[in-house]
């Protein structure tokens, strides 16, 4: 799909474009925009470059879509007034939640599981501890 269309779409419709071109029958040649590639490789048939990364871009881009959707919905639910989102690491959300705010934690967990309508259920792994250092 990336080779023919020139892009892939993530789960929520963001596009990852493949606008660079390289010689079809050579490996390791530098990729250029289409007009530049015609200048650099005038007698060679061209193909889109980097399309081998399309599947990974689809998976990681869709994961980012889901994570961002969860963050927005947790914010819109007003939960960030009660719990503290400390950081994100790839598809992970790290919170600091007081023990007396477990209801907010459970609500945010439910939002993470349902933030995107999928045919298969999303699972969420949880690790808890009294401090960041006690979490394994």
Regions found by a protein language model. Give the residues of each.
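Conserved catalytic core of nucleotide polymerization and phosphodiester-bond processing enzymes
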Residues: 1-136
């Amino acid at each position: 799909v990336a080779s023919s269309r020139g892009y892939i779409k993530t789960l929520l419709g963001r596009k990852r474009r493949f606008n660079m071109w390289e010689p079809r029958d050579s490996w390791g040649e530098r990729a250029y925009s289409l007009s530049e590639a015609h200048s650099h490789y005038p007698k060679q048939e061209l193909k889109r470059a980097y399309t081998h990364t399309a599947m990974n871009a689809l998976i990681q881009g869709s994961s980012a879509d889901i994570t961002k959707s969860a963050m927005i919905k947790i914010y819109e639910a007003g939960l960030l007034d009660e719990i503290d989102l400390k950081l994100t690491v790839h598809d992970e959300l790290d919170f600091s939640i007081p023990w007396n705010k477990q209801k907010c934690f459970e609500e945010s967990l439910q939002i993470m599981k349902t933030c995107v309508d999928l045919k298969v259920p999303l699972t969420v792994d949880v690790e808890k501890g009294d401090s960041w250092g006690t979490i394994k």
